[in-house]
């Protein structure tokens, strides 16, 4: 992706990278109204940044990555106007031990399961599971994090991360805040020829509980939920054929004492809440330039004794004009059965809720990498 590299000496390099994605979409029902609108980053997050490496010898490298996500609609950076809100980390890698990173970065759910999900791979926010409850799209990035990733050992890789709360007092105002707004996670992946398998566990404690003048592991500007505890379990699998890539993932998110959610005006607190997501997706490489992509997700939830469930289907056709530039047509449909719960209105991620139980979105766009 780097368009050029700045070289300090033969063993060091810094590269500029980025992506811009824009679309025009028609939605059938947002608050009871049709809409035609400009959509920034519908299939992938628009971002620019720098990444670099310095060869330290003996199989060791110093590495870093800075990434700034931005809105192509108005040019603002996000989330919350951060200069490097996407990535800001530095680390060391060793060819036999693995890689250690420190800073702001993607969580382990994205690391291990992102490639198996349309929302985390080619479909973007519109294909995320309802409310992005498992963070497979990446609603939140992680602050104050230390992450380890092993090398491949006969196809097996593993790793984990811990993110500090940076807080001295507990939410209640007394005692230690060490466990408030912290995150820890672990994952494993196995690859053998055309087959890939992965599993991950991630836990957040009091996410969105900001430290005055600083940030916890997941601050309120990023959090997909605010809750006393959020646990995410997930597995994924993929199989690559000659012209078809097949993937599937199953995730479960359990919330204790949830009080808020990142986009849903329907949300009200409950003593507990859980979501189960089942997704299958495929990419058919019709020609060297044309890809046909599709995904289906079925989500069930348990909310205050109610059992809402969602069906979501998405289809995307992408045509590459070059290695860097492509055109696409995209469509997503969602239908929800609310079962008398607070989730009685369809809401494709990033849209306003519908006035009923179904919502559809159709559009075209252009994407350029540099």
Residue ranges and their predicted role:
Residues 11-27, 35-167, 180-182, 188-200, ...:
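Outer membrane beta-barrel
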Residues 4-10:
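Sec/Tat signal peptide C-region and signal peptidase I cleavage site
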Residues 15-17, 61-63, 99-101, 157-159, ...:
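Residue-level detector of the transmembrane beta-barrel scaffold of outer-membrane proteins
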Residues 321, 356-370:
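Outer-membrane beta-barrel "beta-signal"
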Residues 24-32, 70-76, 108-112, 166-170, ...:
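Gram-negative outer-membrane beta-barrel proteins
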Residues 33-37, 76, 132-133, 170-174, ...:
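Extracellular loop and loop/strand-boundary signature of outer-membrane beta-barrel proteins
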Residues 49-51, 89-92, 147-149, 187-189, ...:
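Outer-membrane beta-barrel architecture
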Residues 179, 187-314, 333-334:
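Detector for outer-membrane/organellar transmembrane beta-barrel domains
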């Amino acid at each position: 992706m780097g368009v050029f590299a700045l070289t300090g000496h033969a063993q060091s390099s810094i590269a500029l990278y980025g992506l811009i994605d824009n679309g025009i979409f028609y939605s059938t029902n947002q608050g009871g109204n049709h809409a035609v609108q400009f959509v920034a980053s519908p299939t992938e997050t628009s971002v620019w940044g720098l990444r670099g490496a310095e060869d330290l010898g003996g199989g060791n490298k110093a590495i870093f990555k800075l990434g700034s996500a931005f809105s192509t609609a108005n040019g603002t950076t996000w989330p919350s106007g951060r200069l490097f809100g996407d990535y800001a980390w530095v680390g060391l890698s060793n060819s036999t031990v693995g890689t250690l990173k420190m800073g702001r970065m993607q969580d382990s759910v994205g690391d291990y399961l992102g490639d198996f999900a349309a929302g985390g791979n080619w479909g973007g926010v519109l294909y995320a599971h309802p409310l992005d409850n498992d963070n497979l799209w990446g609603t939140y990035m992680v602050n104050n994090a230390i992450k380890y990733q092993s090398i491949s050992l006969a196809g097996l890789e593993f790793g984990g991360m811990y993110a500090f709360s940076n807080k001295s007092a507990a939410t209640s105002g007394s005692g230690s805040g060490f466990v408030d707004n912290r995150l820890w996670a672990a994952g494993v992946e196995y690859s053998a020829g055309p087959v890939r398998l992965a599993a991950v566990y991630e836990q957040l404690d009091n996410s969105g509980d900001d430290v005055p003048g600083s940030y916890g592991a997941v601050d309120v500007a990023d959090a997909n939920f605010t809750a006393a505890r959020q646990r995410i379990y997930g597995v994924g699998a993929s199989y690559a054929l000659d012209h078809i890539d097949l993937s599937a993932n199953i995730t479960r998110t359990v919330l204790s004492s949830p009080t808020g959610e990142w986009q849903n005006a329907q949300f009200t607190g409950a003593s507990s809440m859980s979501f189960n997501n089942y997704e299958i997706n495929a990419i058919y490489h019709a020609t060297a330039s044309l890809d046909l992509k599709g995904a289906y997700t079925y989500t069930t939830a348990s909310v205050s004794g109610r059992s809402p469930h969602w069906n979501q289907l998405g289809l995307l056709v992408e045509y590459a004009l070059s290695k860097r530039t492509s055109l696409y047509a995209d469509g997503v449909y969602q239908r929800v059965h609310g079962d008398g719960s607070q989730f009685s209105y369809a809401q494709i991620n990033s849209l306003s809720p519908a006035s009923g139980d179904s919502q559809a979105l159709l559009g075209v766009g252009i994407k350029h990498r540099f």
